Amino acid sequence: VTIRVAVAGATGKMGRLAARLIDEADDLELHAGLDSRSNLDELEGADVVLDVTHPAASPAIVEAAIDAGMAVVVGTSGWSRERIADVERRLRDLDDAPGVIFVPNFSVGSVLGSAFAALAADHFDSIEIVEAHHAGKVDSPSGTAVRTAELIAAARGEDGPVAAPHADQRARGQLVSGVPVHSMRMAGLLADQRVVLGGEGETLTIQHTTIAPTAYEKGILLALRRAATAEGVTVGLDALLGLHLPGTR
């Protein structure tokens, strides 16, 4: 069975990458490619919509796709837990609701790095995240850093927030689920994240660096293929990889 995919954000870097992957895959078909000038009616007839647009445009695209009964893979950053919960409620109101998969990062290595941090979280007193991306990235902290912080907090459970001395000082970063996150945006980078965990007499650093967009290919294809039969809301590529992490769905 061929899965017809509409790519919203088709002229961006991720959109162009996805379109090429879809063209090369035997089981996928590029149904439509939308940019900022396109009408959302162009989504009609797709089985799956891939949203790799902009935080301001993403909600309307997701809403239109859901209302039309199309599955959605959301690769756009900026979706808070509250907004994702709104999507869940919207799906519950539909008799034959499609699946929606939110993917903060399509890189398998990055997702595994976040999983390793969650696994280690309960064994260290202090945890902080330092993430760096290219100058064109519009949101900070990154969706990957937010997702990592949420996984860390869920793994620690009743142990309370991560120890973060003087976290009220601006230079200490933004607290996300109790974890200080420091963001850098600069030329010469694509994507890099370090999770630094500190305990008595030792530190552990879990680092992932994306050096080329090809790192996203496996995750994009996996999400598109799973979306066609997905139910409800799925958050994170980790669930599609079979990683059973605390607080995941």
What is each residue range found by the language model?
Residues 8, 52-53, 75-76, 103, ...:
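Structural motif
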Residues 63, 76-100, 108-111, 115-119:
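Rossmann-fold NAD(P)-binding glycine/threonine-rich loop
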Residues 55-56, 78-79, 105-106, 186:
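Short glycine-rich anion-binding loops that position phosphate/pyrophosphate groups of nucleotides
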Residues 52, 56-75, 84-86:
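Rossmann-fold NAD(P) dinucleotide-binding segment
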Residues 55, 59, 114, 214:
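Glycine-rich phosphate-binding loop at the start of an alpha helix
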Residues 30, 72-73, 100-102:
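Hydrophobic beta-strand scaffold residues
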Residues 44-45, 49:
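Alpha-helix C-terminal capping/helix-to-coil transition sites in glycosyltransferase folds
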Residues 4-43, 125-249:
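C-terminal substrate-binding/catalytic lobe of Rossmann-fold NAD(P)-dependent oxidoreductases
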